[in-house]
């Protein structure tokens, strides 16, 4: 399963990690995914969302 937010589609970013000597190597910044249960018209559904999306869901009272 891809490390992607199931509601917003937000995925990992890529770039370089740099030392003080300016050496570089490729790395990946993954999304902080959390399991959440959201309200739907049929009841509730469990989804993987980013921490930022989870915060927004809590703000708008959309969690089951």
Swiss-Prot record:
One of its GO terms (biological process) is translation. Residues 1-26 are annotated as: Disordered. Pfam families: Ribosomal_L28. GO terms for molecular function: structural constituent of ribosome. The keyword Cell inner membrane does not apply. SUPFAM superfamilies: L28p-like. GO terms for cellular component: ribonucleoprotein complex; ribosome. Keywords: Ribonucleoprotein, Ribosomal protein. HAMAP family: Ribosomal_bL28. Belongs to the bacterial ribosomal protein bL28 family. NCBIfam families: L28 (TIGR00009). This is Large ribosomal subunit protein bL28. It comes from Ureaplasma urealyticum serovar 10 (strain ATCC 33699 / Western). The lineage of its organism: Bacteria, Bacillati, Mycoplasmatota, Mycoplasmoidales, Mycoplasmoidaceae.
């Amino acid at each position: 399963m891809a490390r992607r937010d199931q509601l917003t589609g937000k995925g990992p970013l890529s770039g370089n990690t740099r030392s003080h000597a300016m050496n570089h190597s490729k790395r990946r910044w993954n999304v902080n995914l959390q399991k959440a249960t959201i309200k739907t018209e049929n009841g509730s559904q469990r989804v993987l969302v980013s921490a930022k999306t989870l915060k927004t869901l809590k703000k708008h009272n959309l969690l089951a």
